[in-house]
């Protein structure tokens, strides 16, 4: 019984890594750091409804954020998104 609980806990705790790791593989890196503007949109893990903005590689696009999790390609306004991600 203890082993089954342990394995269930390990599996449950590894789910966020299974979701996050592929996104990091597809991201671009600059000076060893992830370029957040190259990350895909990620609505997160919760079911709340926040209108946010992400950079899609060309422009800033609105998406729904659930309120928890996700990645850093998430901005409260289009202006903040463009300021951080748009290339001059």
Swiss-Prot record:
Keyword set includes Disulfide bond: yes
BPTI/Kunitz inhibitor domain: residues covered: 37-85
GO terms of molecular function: potassium channel regulator activity; serine-type endopeptidase inhibitor activity; toxin activity
Any Pfam family matching the protein: Kunitz_BPTI
Domain of life: Eukaryota
Signal peptide range: 1-27
Disulfide bond found in the keyword field: yes
GO-annotated biological processes: envenomation resulting in negative regulation of voltage-gated potassium channel activity in another organism
GO cellular component: extracellular region
PROSITE patterns, A to Z: BPTI_KUNITZ_2
Site residues, Reactive bond for chymotrypsin: 47-48
SMART domains: KU (SM00131)
Identification of the protein by name: Kunitz-type U15-theraphotoxin-Hs1a
Role of this protein: Serine protease inhibitor that inhibits trypsin at a molar ratio of 1:1.
Residues at the site labelled May bind Kv1: 39
């Amino acid at each position: 019984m203890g082993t089954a609980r342990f394995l269930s806990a390990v599996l449950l705790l590894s789910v966020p890594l299974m979701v996050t790791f592929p996104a990091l593989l597809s991201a671009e890196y600059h000076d060893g750091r992830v370029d957040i503007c190259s990350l895909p949109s990620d609505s997160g893990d919760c079911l709340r409804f926040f209108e946010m903005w992400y950079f899609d590689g060309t422009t800033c696009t609105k998406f729904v954020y659930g309120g928890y999790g996700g990645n850093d390609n998430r901005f409260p306004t289009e202006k903040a998104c463009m300021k951080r991600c748009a290339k001059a």
